[in-house]
Amino acid sequence: MSFLKNQLSRLLALILVVAIGLTACDSGTGLTGNYSQDTLTVIATLREAIDLPQDAPNRQEVQDTARGQINDYISRYRRKGDAGGLKSFTTMQTALNSLAGYYTSYGARPIPEKLKKRLQLEFTQAERSIERGV
């Protein structure tokens, strides 16, 4: 009887680990784990978010997607040695920190032109670095 309980307990633990592992694989943000592709995906989403008119009906949805991608991108690549030291990553991290800080402080307010220009410049630099592989 004790042996059966022990085996069932182990089986249940294994099933829970597999279930949690499988649900953790899909972040829901559209990031794949391919650094170059994920960087370009995040840039495209963020460009859409910062260029969206204030009265756009899908503004909140786009901002939520942008926030999710920012969090997922940083959490995936901050500690990875192969991506963390790249120039494109440090440029992206600077841009993402600026935008995340703005969203945290000001929420739904329009992004100032000065910040938009700086973000666009950093996105362009990151894209060029990705193309060169750095």
Curated annotation (Swiss-Prot):
Segment forming the signal sequence: 1-24
Lipidation (N-palmitoyl cysteine): C25
Topology relative to the membrane: Lipid-anchor
Disulfide bonds: none
Keywords in alphabetical order: Lipoprotein, Membrane, Palmitate, Photosynthesis, Photosystem II, Signal, Thylakoid
Pfam families linked: PSII_Pbs27 (PF13326)
Major subcellular location class: membrane
GO cellular component, one term: plasma membrane-derived thylakoid membrane
Summary of the knockout phenotype: Not essential for photoautotrophic growth, under CaCl(2) limiting-conditions absolutely required. Impaired recovery after photoinhibition due to impaired assembly of the calcium-manganese-oxide cluster, especially at high light intensities. CP43 (psbC) is more susceptible to degradation, higher turnover of D1 (psbA). Calcium-manganese-oxide cluster assembly is improved in a double psbO-psb27 mutant. A double psbM-psb27 mutant is incapable of photoautotrophic growth, but does assemble the CP43-less assembly intermediate.
Subcellular locations according to the entry: Cellular thylakoid membrane
Superkingdom of this protein's organism: Bacteria
GO BP annotation list: photosystem II assembly; photosystem II repair
PROSITE patterns: PROKAR_LIPOPROTEIN (PS51257)
Residues covalently joined to lipid (S-diacylglycerol cysteine): C25
Function per UniProt: Plays a role in the repair and/or biogenesis of the calcium-manganese-oxide cluster on the lumenal face of the thylakoid membrane. Photosystem II (PSII) complexes containing this protein are monomeric, are assembly intermediates lacking the calcium-manganese-oxide cluster and miss some of the lumenal subunits. Probably blocks binding of some of the small lumenal subunits.
HAMAP family given in the database record: PSII_Psb27
Listed NCBIfam families: PS_II_psb27
Family to which the UniProt record says this protein belongs: Belongs to the Psb27 family.
Quaternary organization: Monomer. Forms a complex with a monomeric, partially assembled PSII. This is probably the complex in which D1 is assembled and/or replaced. Present in 6-10% of PSII complexes; mostly in monomeric PSII. These PSII do not evolve oxygen, do not have an assembled calcium-manganese-oxide cluster.
This protein's name: Photosystem II lipoprotein Psb27
